[in-house]
Amino acid sequence: MTWTTHDYENIPGTYVFDGKHSYGAYPLNKLLFSFNTEECRTEFDADPAAYCDKFGVEGKYKEFVLKKDFLGMLRAGANIYFMAKMAIPRGTSVQDAGAQFQGITTKEFQAKLLAKGDGLVERLAKRGGYWNG
């Protein structure tokens, strides 16, 4: 398969989710998506390695799953929304994962989030009372 190179691929700290990145992670994403059902989550919890094998998740992808290495999964092409299906039911919050992505503690990540909220009311007022990112 031939992939086109895009400018967005070289933005530091950004992990692009596109066809090129996600192609090799298809079995991983299929596994993560399966966590939509309680039955699948229970089966995974009973034997994570066997569950990876069931979906054909191998090599570095399997290692990331078994270690709950969310940054590794993201870098390898995992869909961030599917990863939440693995993380949240197992007691890992979105803030925990965000902290791991940035290489900081959850408390540091929470402090960064709160700091970004400083002056939000004033910024909203300047934008006409709405926020679009």
Language-model-detected regions and their locations in the chain:
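Charged, low-complexity intrinsically disordered segments
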Residues: 1-133
